[in-house]
Amino acid sequence: MPNIEELKQRQEKIRNFSIIAHIDHGKSTLADRILEKTETVSSREMQAQLLDSMDLERERGITIKLNAIELNYKAKDGETYIFHLIDTPGHVDFTYEVSRSLAACEGAILVVDAAQGIEAQTLANVYLALDNDLEILPVINKIDLPAADPERVRTEIEDVIGLDASEAVLASAKAGIGIEEILEQIVEKVPAPQGDVEAPLQALIFDSVYDAYRGVILQVRVVNGMVKTGDKIQMMSNGKTFDVTEVGIFTPKAVGRDYLATGDVGYVAASIKTVADTRVGDTVTLADNPAAEPLHGYKQMNPMVFAGLYPIESNKYNDLREALEKLQLNDASLQFEPETSQALGFGFRCGFLGLLHMDVIQERLEREFNIDLIMTAPSVVYHVNTTDGEMLEVSNPSEFPDPTRIDAIEEPYVKAQIMVPQEYVGAVMELAQRKRGDFETMEYIDDNRVNVIYQIPLAEIVFDFFDKLKSSTRGYASFDYELSEYRRSQLVKMDILLNGDKVDALSFIVHREFAYERGKLIVDKLKKIIPRQQFEVPIQAAIGQKIVARTDIKALRKNVLAKCYGGDVSRKRKLLEKQKAGKKRMKAIGSVEVPQEAFLSVLSMDEDEK
C-alpha cells in the first residue's frame, strides 16, 4: 500500500478527460487511436470502435453508453501520466449520459470535423462542458478529407463557440495524424484532479452494470479519500452499507486493483444484490468515517416521450419487469410503471428522453433479454386543466378525462436549433411550419451555414421530425432541442374503433385542425394492415361521440355453393341464408386480431401520403 506522499504525487500525474463531438465527427475512432498510441490495447485485440462494446452501438455507428478507461502515457518530459478517458455519446437523446461523464472529468477534447464544421450537438455538448468548468482542447479532425477546410473551421470555433482555436490540433484519427500532439496537450493543459486523499471518502457513481455473479458493479470517480477491498461503504442517499469485495479499473477489460484513490476512475463491486439500492449520481462514502455531505450529483432528467411496452407473450411480464430494472441501472433516465390495456394486457408505461432512446431501449430488451414486445404510439406529457379547476399531467391518451370535463389542454413546446446549409433553409422552414412550429430567429454561422431556431410542439417532433429533416436536407441538417414551455393548444383525443369497440392502445392526441385528415389516413392504413376476417369489420375514427372517418374491411366468404351442382334455387338460397346467420353470430362474438404493425402504423403517419 503506497503512503500518503506517494499517493499525492500520483494524483499530480492523473488526467481525467472525455471526448465530445457531434455524431460521425470521429470520436470513437480518435478514442481507438489513443488506445493504440498508449499501447493500452495490443494491435491483436484492436477492433474498430473498441469502446462501443454493445452490438447495437457498432451496428448503428453511434455511442450510447459512456465508458471509462485507464491508460498510461509516457510524455515527452519523461514522466508517465495516468489518463482516464471517459467516452461519451454524441446524440441529442443521450445528453444526460454526456453530462454524467463530464462531471467525472477535468478536461474535454472537442472534436470538430474539418469538412462539416460545427454542428448543433457539438454546441450543446460544449455548453455542458463549460457548465462543468472543463478545460476544452479543440481538435480539428479528418484533415485528410478532400473537402477539409481546417482554417474555416478554426475561425468557426472562435466565432461560434468563442474558444481560442489558435493551438487547435489538426488531426486525422483514421490516418493516425496528430495523435501525439493531442496527448501532449492533455498533459500540459488539463489540470490534475483536485481533492484530498486524507479526507473521508467521497466517490461519485457515474454508471453501474449488473453482473449475475457479483451483483451490481458501480463505476465511480473518487473525488476525495480512497477505497480498498474489505472497506465497508455506505450510500449517502439511503444510508445502506455494503462490504467491498473488489475494486479495479477498466483497460477496456476489468482489472482488479488494491485500492482506488483521489482522482481515480474505476469500479467497485460490493455484493449489492438489489438493483434499487444504487442510484447513478449518488455518493459513496465509508461507513466508519462518513463524509459530511454528498457530492453535487446530477440533475434528474425528466422523460420527454412516453410509450407503452407490452410483452407479446403475457407470461413474460415479470421477465420484462426484471429486464427494465437492469436497464435502469445504467440508464437512470429510463422510467417505467405498470399499466394494463384491454387490447394488450399487462405491460409498462415507460418514459424516454427521446425517440432514439426509445428505439435503443426496445432493441436492447429484445436482444439482451429475448423479450418480444409490442410498443404503442409514443406520446408526451400534456397538462389538462379540468372544468373544476384541477390540473392533471397525462402522458397516456387513454387516461384523458371525458371531453366535457376538459377546460383547456397545454402541450410542451421545445426550442429547436436546426443547423443547415443555406440552400436548404426553405425546406427546413416549410417542414417546421407543417409541424406547427413558430419561427423565432435565424443566425448565420458562416457564409454558407445557418442556425434556424423554432418553437415546435414536442408531440410533432416525437413522430418523425428527425427523419423528415434529414430527407428534406439530404442529411446535411443537424438538430438539437430542449424543453422550453407549455402552451395552450386546440387538442383533441382521437379513438379508433374496430367492430364498434375502442382499441385503447390505438388512441392518440391530435390537433383539431388535422384531426379529420389524420383520422382518415389511419383508418385507411389499418384497412390495409388488419387481415380480412370471416365477417365484415368497420374501422372508425372518433372524437368523443362523433365519428369523423370510417372504412370497412370486407368479409372473406367461403363458396358454400361449390358442392351444389345444378339443383334447386331454393336449396342454394338455404345454404346462403345459413352462411349469413353464421356470419352474424360470429360478428356478435368475434374478436378482431390486430397485428403489431397496426400499432406502429399510428406512429408513422405521414402527411405526404395524403
UniProtKB/Swiss-Prot annotation:
It catalyses: GTP + H2O = GDP + phosphate + H(+). It is found in: Cell membrane. It is a peripheral membrane protein. GO terms for cellular component: plasma membrane. Keywords: Cell membrane, GTP-binding, Hydrolase, Membrane, Nucleotide-binding, Protein biosynthesis. It is an enzyme of class 3 (hydrolase). GTP binds at residues 24-29, 141-144. Its main location: membrane. InterPro entries: EF-4 (IPR006297), EFG_III/V (IPR035647), EFG_V-like (IPR000640), EFTu-like_2 (IPR004161), G_TR_CS (IPR031157), LepA_C_sf (IPR038363), LepA_CTD (IPR013842), LepA_IV (IPR035654). The keyword GTP-binding applies. It comes from the Bacteria. It holds the Pfam family GTP_EFTU_D2. GO terms for molecular function: GTP binding; GTPase activity; ribosome binding; translation elongation factor activity. Residues 12-194 form the tr-type G domain. One of its GO terms (biological process) is positive regulation of translation. Its EC number is 3.6.5.n1. Belongs to the TRAFAC class translation factor GTPase superfamily. Classic translation factor GTPase family. LepA subfamily. HAMAP family: LepA. Required for accurate and efficient protein synthesis under certain stress conditions. May act as a fidelity factor of the translation reaction, by catalyzing a one-codon backward translocation of tRNAs on improperly translocated ribosomes. Back-translocation proceeds from a post-translocation (POST) complex to a pre-translocation (PRE) complex, thus giving elongation factor G a second chance to translocate the tRNAs correctly. Binds to ribosomes in a GTP-dependent manner. This is Elongation factor 4. It comes from Streptococcus thermophilus (strain ATCC BAA-491 / LMD-9).
